[in-house]
Amino acid sequence: MAKIVLCMVLLAFGRQVYGASLVPAPISEQDPELATCELQLSKYRRFILQAILSFEDVCDAYSSRPGGQDSDSEGWPFRHYAPPPTSQRGEIWAFFRLLMAQFGDKEFSPIIRDAVIERCRIKSQLQRDEKRNSVVLGKKQRFHSWGGKRSPEPPILPDY
């Protein structure tokens, strides 16, 4: 019985010493206004990221950066990109630049960069697969009897 009581005391003492006392609660749980701000920031980041990734030419925009792909210490990774003037993309890219500059979200820039790199990698892989599949299909059409160009078979002449 004494051992059980001793174990209970040690468990209670251990929980108090090693439990919540060493790991303080996150600030957002203590301050509801901060939790609201974190939620709004998360929504803003998701919106901007999805909007940027929805552009078909986002890979061109990222590739057009001067100084290589690793020089994004300035923050906005698409600073030097100018979309074609015939579309509304110029206005939208300007809007994104304005949002990024206003919020000064320095830690969000690497998130955008990594997402764009991943999207461009997937897009490149899909294009490579599509090209490979079209080449394979072309070979099948050429060399198989079910399609494509075939050389005409010589007529079979009867033996006399």
From Swiss-Prot:
Molecular function terms from GO: diuretic hormone activity; hormone activity; neuropeptide hormone activity; receptor ligand activity
Propeptide: 20-130, 151-160
Residue positions where Glycine amide is found in the record: G147
Location in or out of the cell: Secreted
Keyword annotations of the record: Amidation, Cleavage on pair of basic residues, Neuropeptide, Secreted, Signal
Signal peptide (from-to): 1-19
Subcellular location, principal: secreted
Organism: Drosophila melanogaster
GO cellular component: extracellular space
Any one GO biological process: negative regulation of feeding behavior
Listed name of the protein: Leucokinin
Function: Acts through intracellular calcium in Malpighian tubule stellate cells to raise chloride conductance.
